[in-house]
Amino acid sequence: QVGQRLILTKALGTGTLFAADMRLKAKGRWVQSALQNMIQSNREAARCLFEHDTSACTDVTGFGLLGHLVEMTKASAVNVELEIENLPYLDGVIETLAERIFSSLYPQNRHFQTGISNNASLMKHPLYPLLFDPQTAGGLLASVPNDKAQDCLKALHALGYEDACIIGRVISESSQISPITILS
């Protein structure tokens, strides 16, 4: 719904980190951090989001953040702004993305870039590839009323979802082919 905030409950980057691990280019602490992130259940986060009147929610998995956001925006017929600098990411992700180490699912997830209205201006941003990174046991992406977003975030942090953050907002109703504007 227009005016709502987009909350992501877990950090991104499992795809690139495990691709790096398979190439023996990931540090042990990076993999350990990713595993800790993955074993955290989404159950309490889902309950918290529900208690804060979320109107739409999905898990972020193999299609990556952008793939799931495109599906959410199209199903809800809304446009959103996504703040790329606010994306939470796991230790080692900046390094693996800089080395252009991607999951085998990454190339097919790139087709979701058609959902970005200002795609051309962002392709060189260091976090751009993270938008397409497939997640294993990823977090939840939810749309929460603006007046409840900060309380929801505090509650998520108290429940142990330390990386939970607001990554964007719903700006208008629409049925555009490219419903997502990325802010950097």
Predicted features and spans:
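Helix-biased detector of long, well-ordered alpha-helical tracts
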Residues: 1-184
